[in-house]
Structure formats: C-alpha cells, structure tokens
Amino acid sequence: MPIHPLNTTNHIRSTYLRYLRTIKPFQNEWYRQAFADAVDESDLLVKGPILEIALPYEKEQSIKDLVEEGVLSKEFANLQSPDLPYTRPMYVHQVRAIRKAVSGRNLVVATGTGSGKTETFLVPILNYLFREQENGTLSQPGVRAMLLYPMNALANDQMKRLRRLLENCKDITFGRYIGETDRSNDRDEAIRNFQKVYPKEKILDNELFSRKEI
C-alpha cells in the first residue's frame, strides 16, 4: 500500500516525541514544561525524511517451479500459507541462494531491506525438514536448525511467522528461547504462563513453550 512520505514522517515524529515527553514524569510543572519544550525544539531527535528510489528486484522462479524441478520437497505444496506463497515468483537472489543452500553450499546474502532475506535461509531449512520427513528420520531427537537474532523483538517477529507456517506441520516442533522463555518443567504450566502474556495466541501442539522442552 502506498504511503505519503511527509505525512508518515510527521506521524512518526509526533508519536516519538509524545513518548519522550512521558518518560520523565517531573512533579514540578516548570520542569515538566521545560523538558517538553526541549524535546519539541530539538533538531537532533528526528531527521528526515530521507528518501531513496530503488529499482524493483528481478524475479525468477516460484517455489512451485523448484518443487517440479526436484530442487525442493513436494511437501511445500501442503503449506498453503500466504507467508510463503507457493506460486508467486521469487527474486533472483532468493532462487540462487536457495539452490546453493540446498546443494550444501555455504553462503552470505547481502541485499536490500524488504527484499526477502528470510526466505533465503527459511526455505532451505524447511526443505531439509521435509526431506527428513520423507525419509522417516524426522522423529529422531535433535535440533535441526537455530535462528539467532540480536534482539528479542526480531526473534518475536520471526516466531509469529513460524507459527503461521508450521501450524499444520505437526511433525515439526519449534520453540523460542529468549530471556522470558518459561523455566517451568511442566508443559501445561508453561502454556498457562504463555497465555497470560499472549492471550490471543493459539496454542499449537508442535510448539515448545518451556526451556526443558526446547
């Protein structure tokens, strides 16, 4: 959906400054107003907008194409998730990265923001799990993949996507290990604690909620 860069910048600026004015609740009215004025008048807190025109990334094959070619597992057809469209063409760098990863090559992906870096490692990981499922080895215990993020917010965002993707993949277990991961040894208790924090989230049978489970 197109956005107006100036209106969006003004909205972000006003929201951010409003937040800053509330983080220091001075009891004295004079200090409170002086702090608010300093926040509003500063030209160091918000810059921009800084606009950049970027050409669209070149597209190539879809996941469906790679499945039919034999590069990826046929199990991808069963995902049926808008988070990983089966028939939508992927970017060239995504297809190249997937091919290299599936063939056992190491790689580094450097590309622009919003250009689908996640798919370059997530698709090969899912393919590896699906291949194990096909070979009957997925039930054997062990961690197959670890996704490392520098901040909880990034880990939480990825977790939301994984929950949507793997909701119907009952044989694939997954979990999130961060500071707030439940320390309980009891799964039911861990789920209750999870629901207190995320009351709207659906509980998945293949999700691991406690540190002991993970």
Predicted feature locations:
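Inter-Walker segment of RecA-like/P-loop motor cores
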Residues: 170-214
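Helicase-associated low-complexity/disordered flanking segments
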Residues: 1-96, 168, 172-175, 191-198
